[in-house]
Amino acid sequence: MKITQEEVTHVANLSKLRFSEKETAAFATTLSKIVDMVELLGEVDTTGVAPTTTMADRKTVLRPDVAEEGTDRDRLFKNVPEQDNYYIKVPAILDDGGDA
């Protein structure tokens, strides 16, 4: 499956990323190769092969859900450069949120 430069540009725009034309072409080529490799997996005959759900040889180990005392909020916010009513203020990275 060929990934076009237009598709790469579209996804980059949704992600608020900017790439040069050369980078976009390289991404399109690389992504096309990756998709082709993944599509090859569909050709493998897995008849009679049991599904693999995990590579771990043990079952999920869950800890008891016990409430513990948390860290003091004032102590946590001691090193925060800017805050407002216990919210950490950070610089905006998106102009208006776009259409994503």
From Swiss-Prot:
E.C. number: 6.3.5.-
Top-rank taxon, per record: Bacteria
Gene Ontology MF terms in the entry: asparaginyl-tRNA synthase (glutamine-hydrolyzing) activity; ATP binding; glutaminyl-tRNA synthase (glutamine-hydrolyzing) activity
Entry keyword Zinc: no
Reactions it catalyzes: L-glutamyl-tRNA(Gln) + L-glutamine + ATP + H2O = L-glutaminyl-tRNA(Gln) + L-glutamate + ADP + phosphate + H(+); L-aspartyl-tRNA(Asn) + L-glutamine + ATP + H2O = L-asparaginyl-tRNA(Asn) + L-glutamate + ADP + phosphate + 2 H(+)
GO biological process, one term: glutaminyl-tRNAGln biosynthesis via transamidation
Keywords linked to the UniProt accession: ATP-binding, Ligase, Nucleotide-binding, Protein biosynthesis
Enzyme class (EC, first level): ligase
Its job: Allows the formation of correctly charged Asn-tRNA(Asn) or Gln-tRNA(Gln) through the transamidation of misacylated Asp-tRNA(Asn) or Glu-tRNA(Gln) in organisms which lack either or both of asparaginyl-tRNA or glutaminyl-tRNA synthetases. The reaction takes place in the presence of glutamine and ATP through an activated phospho-Asp-tRNA(Asn) or phospho-Glu-tRNA(Gln).
Classification via HAMAP family: GatC (MF_00122)
Subunit structure, interactors included: Heterotrimer of A, B and C subunits.
Family: Belongs to the GatC family.
PANTHER family in alphabetical order: GLUTAMYL-TRNA(GLN) AMIDOTRANSFERASE SUBUNIT C, MITOCHONDRIAL
Full protein name: Aspartyl/glutamyl-tRNA(Asn/Gln) amidotransferase subunit C
Species in which this protein is naturally found: Streptococcus pneumoniae (strain P1031)
Lineage: Bacteria, Bacillati, Bacillota, Bacilli, Lactobacillales
The encoding gene: gatC
